[in-house]
Regions:
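Conserved beta-loop-alpha segment that forms the PLP phosphate-binding cup at the N-terminus of a helix
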Residues: 63-91, 95, 99-103
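PLP-dependent enzyme catalytic core of the Aspartate aminotransferase-like
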Residues: 338, 342-392
Length: 392
């Protein structure tokens, strides 16, 4: 009788969606190291390296850096659960899906959520944001630096300056910026920032890097009510990672992977890494526009990690994505919410942000569009090659 459960063999995939992204062989190799216990001295040695490297990746001198056991949404919930308080005003700047998720979490904490909303993919006017924060006088301000639903990069500094003028602290979602674009926690004045592992860091999902400023830690100590989440209580987590007191069973394997991915970030250097992402993003956009497609987000507001070209008229985005998966083993994503069927979300981030992958995705996307009857206006690969050559 044949074995109904033979050894697992996952299909090969080229991950060019909004995450997870491609993982470097070096990171995979780290995950094959011996598993140790979550209170083993070696585990804490690795965890200490991870905490230091998280500070480097976020461009911060904050001593409080953690990797939360959970995905980026766990990082979001940790930030909100510790700093949103019942009855206190929580100001949300929203121009995409994930900002509204922050708001939902804050409401569940009992905070009074007030919202400045923009159309998905449209930037905030700095003066309007400043006036909104001044008028509301909130306890906390939250925004998404890199909005994964739209490919939008929101400028942090004006928001943080306005929040601090009002006496508020700032939470920033850096899920799709960390490791691929400048986050600059200290320079921008971000008080609490969180991210994930499976995008710009090029690591499998499962941990959420988080950093907290000394000013925010003082606020946390003065909470009127206990943090409602035991698992995500930052004070308890700190006793685990710095005091080596049991809290939960952290995954040694995921910490090995994150340690290696962050070490690769440090070896490359943040500025060089950002420039690599910027160069490949610009080449990809040059190719997309040469093919006759438009980008959802205006030039200066685009993410370098996640590209959002609009779906041409008459093209079924789901069929394009299925073609890429079935014929090329390539995963990209579509839009959702008000952008469902209107955009592609194509990630070139972390280990996957290379000139070769720019060409690969442009060629494959062109073939998928032709299969739908779309005739490109020009040669996307040639335009991308020209952009890459000009950037050298």
């Amino acid at each position: 009788m044949p074995n109904p459960y033979p050894p697992l063999q996952a299909p090969p995939r080229l991950l060019f969606g909004p995450g997870p992204s491609l993982v470097a062989p070096r990171v995979y190799a780290a995950m094959t190291q011996n598993v140790v216990g979550h209170l083993d001295p070696f585990f804490f040695e690795v965890a200490d390296q991870v905490r230091s490297l998280i500070g480097y990746a976020f461009s911060t001198a904050n001593p409080f850096n953690l990797a939360i056991s959970g995905t980026g949404s766990a990082g979001m919930e940790a930030a909100v659960a510790n700093f949103a308080e019942p009855g206190r005003k929580f100001a949300l700047l929203s121009n995409g899906f994930f900002a509204d998720r922050i708001g939902e979490m804050a409401r569940r904490q009992g905070a009074e959520v007030v919202r400045l909303a923009k159309e998905w993919g449209k930037p905030f006017d700095p003066q309007e944001a400043r006036e909104f924060i001044r008028r509301q006088q909130p306890h906390m301000v939250a925004f998404v630096q890199a909005e994964t639903s739209t490919g939008m990069y929101n400028q942090a500094k004006p928001i943080c300056e306005a929040a601090h003028e009002a006496g508020a602290l700032v939470i920033a979602d850096c899920v799709t910026s960390l490791g691929g674009m400048p986050v600059l926690v200290d320079e921008n004045g971000i008080d609490i920032a969180y991210s994930c592992t499976q995008k710009g860091l090029g690591c499998p999902p499962g941990l959420a890097p988080l950093t907290v400023s000394p000013r925010a830690l003082e606020r946390l100590k003065g909470r009127a009510a206990p943090v409602q989440s035991w698992y995500l209580d930052l004070a308890l987590l700190d006793t685990y990672y710095t005091g080596h007191k049991y809290h939960h069973t952290a995954s040694a394997t995921l910490f090995y992977a994150l340690r290696e991915a962050l070490a690769m970030v440090a070896e490359e250097g943040l500025e060089r890494r950002w420039e690599r992402h910027r160069r490949n993003h610009l080449a990809f956009v040059a190719g997309i526009e040469a093919m006759g497609l438009e980008m959802l987000v205006a030039g200066g507001d685009r993410l370098w990690t996640l590209n959002t070209p609009c779906v041409p008229a008459g093209v079924d985005d789901a069929k394009v994505r299925q073609y890429l998966l079935d014929r090329r083993g390539i995963e990209i994503a579509g839009g959702f919410g008000p952008l469902a069927g209107k955009i592609f979300r194509i990630g070139l981030m972390g280990y996957g942000s290379t000139g070769e992958n720019v060409m690969l995705v442009l060629e494959a996307l062109g073939a998928a569009l032709r299969d739908q009857g779309y005739q490109a206006a020009g040669d996307g690969r040639a335009a991308a090659e020209k952009a890459l050559a000009a950037a050298v």
